[in-house]
Amino acid sequence: MASPDVEYRCFVGGLAWATDERSLETAFSQFGELVDSKIINDRETGRSRGFGFVTFKDEKSMKDAIEGMNGQDLDGRSITVNEAQSRGSGAGGGGRGGGGGYRGGGGYGGGGGGYGGGRREGGGYSGGGGGYSSRGGGGGGYGGGGRRDGGGYGGGEGGGYGGGGGGGW
């Protein structure tokens, strides 16, 4: 399955609750043509989970956006912008440090868990394979991860979005 599904997608974290897809699109469109902008909402409450994705038409625009927007203020909050790997690409455990973040293993919708879990002991947004921006972190994940004791926002060994340990969200 070597389809040319190359996506130039950025993960955008630390979003203000008030940030909507239109303001996300406005902030990032200065770097190039956007294919998509999406804010992830909680399934039950419909409220923003504080992160989203923007997809560019070309790689240069994506890299310029990461360089230009990471650490910048958007709607009163300092945001984090990283390259996101497509959910369908890469063989498990790949990426830097293996098994964490958006470069393989866990990540949003990847690994053994994905959005909403799916493992016997928990799951959460990134299952048992690492947090949203963890590079090599195991365990944790946004909503807990596949361990009863791990979890928290980034959980596990290698960090993650906001640190480790201490119960699920």
Swiss-Prot record:
Q: Where is the RRM domain?
A: 8-86
Cite a single Pfam family from the UniProt record: RRM_1
Name the chain's protein. Glycine-rich RNA-binding protein GRP2A
Provide the taxonomic classification.
Eukaryota, Viridiplantae, Streptophyta, Embryophyta, Tracheophyta
User: From which organism does this entry originate?
Assistant: Sinapis alba (White mustard)
Gene Ontology molecular-function annotations: RNA binding
Q: Which UniProt keywords apply?
A: Nucleus, RNA-binding
| Biased composition range(s): Gly residues | 89-100
Function noted in UniProt: May play a general role in circadian phenomena associated with meristematic tissue.
- Chain segments carrying region Disordered: 69-100, 125-169
